[in-house]
């Protein structure tokens, strides 16, 4: 099994922990990661864009001028697509953009993304991060202690508890910092680690996990 340095929130090394090779040290599959991100971003589209065709725009039922003897180009309706205030040809209509991936591919994509960050040396594991109250100052201090104050950072916390929600709130006003709850049942994640996703991992230069998060991810992705 691979080993990773364990830090506390003061940035001090307090030991090493083993992490599962089959989760954090696989060969990244770029194709599957792309498919996951494509699915994720496509599914985030509302699909509500709508335009009116010439038949749906109000008015235009009367021919604007006679067909002949005016010297003007013949026109059948003031709602034709080339008229101002006319309809739109081939414009968007409400549609469902839903894409799916099977569970095996979703798991492989998550493993690939986590492994890529680990192999680059951009995966940081801390013993735990708990705040008794939400305070941006505390989060800035943690970032400074870990030497990642100027990085784009993703924090993944193990479960939904008040002390972890406070961490999430503490990071929301810091540019480049995102905090997600791995065990959040309201976030709609495909493999029951709700909140953890490939796009956020790849979109961050550093990924910070707690030891509890590591074990939770191993539990789900090793199945």
Curated annotation (Swiss-Prot):
Q: Which terms are listed as keywords in the entry?
A: Ribonucleoprotein, Ribosomal protein, RNA-binding, rRNA-binding
Q: Which Gene3D superfamilies has this protein been placed in?
A: 3.40.1370.10
- Which Pfam family, an example, fits this chain? Ribosomal_L4
Gene Ontology cellular-component annotations: ribonucleoprotein complex; ribosome
- In terms of superkingdom, the source organism counts as Bacteria
Q: Name one GO molecular function term.
A: rRNA binding
Residues covered by region (Disordered): 47-72
UniProt record, GO biological process? translation
Instruction: Write out the similarity annotation.
Output: Belongs to the universal ribosomal protein uL4 family.
- Self-association or partners: how does it assemble? Part of the 50S ribosomal subunit.
Summarize the protein's role: One of the primary rRNA binding proteins, this protein initially binds near the 5'-end of the 23S rRNA. It is important during the early stages of 50S assembly. It makes multiple contacts with different domains of the 23S rRNA in the assembled 50S subunit and ribosome. Forms part of the polypeptide exit tunnel.
- PANTHER family for this protein: 50S RIBOSOMAL PROTEIN L4, LARGE RIBOSOMAL SUBUNIT PROTEIN UL4M
Protein name stated in the entry: Large ribosomal subunit protein uL4
Origin organism of this chain?
Answer: Fervidobacterium nodosum (strain ATCC 35602 / DSM 5306 / Rt17-B1)
Cite the source lineage: Bacteria, Thermotogati, Thermotogota, Thermotogae, Thermotogales
């Amino acid at each position: 099994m691979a080993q990773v340095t364990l830090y506390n929130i003061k940035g001090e090394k307090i030991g090493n922990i083993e992490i599962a090779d089959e989760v954090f040290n696989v060969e990244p599959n770029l194709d599957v990661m792309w498919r996951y991100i494509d699915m994720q971003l496509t599914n985030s589209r509302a699909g509500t864009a709508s335009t009116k065709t010439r038949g749906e725009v109000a008015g235009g039922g009367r021919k604007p001028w006679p067909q002949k003897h005016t010297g003007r180009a013949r026109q059948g309706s003031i709602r034709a697509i080339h008229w101002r205030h006319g309809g739109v040809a081939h414009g968007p209509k409400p549609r469902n953009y839903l894409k799916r991936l099977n569970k095996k591919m979703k798991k492989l994509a998550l493993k690939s993304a986590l492994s890529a960050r680990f192999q680059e040396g951009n995966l940081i594991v801390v013993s735990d991060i708990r705040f008794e109250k939400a305070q941006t100052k505390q989060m800035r201090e943690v970032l400074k202690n870990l030497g990642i104050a100027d990085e784009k950072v993703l924090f993944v916390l193990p479960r939904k508890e008040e002390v972890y929600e406070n961490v999430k709130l503490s990071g929301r006003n810091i540019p480049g910092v995102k905090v997600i709850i791995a065990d959040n049942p309201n976030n709609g994640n495909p493999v029951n680690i709700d909140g953890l996703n490939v796009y956020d991992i790849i979109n961050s230069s550093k990924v910070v996990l707690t030891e509890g998060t590591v074990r939770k991810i191993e539990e789900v992705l090793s199945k």
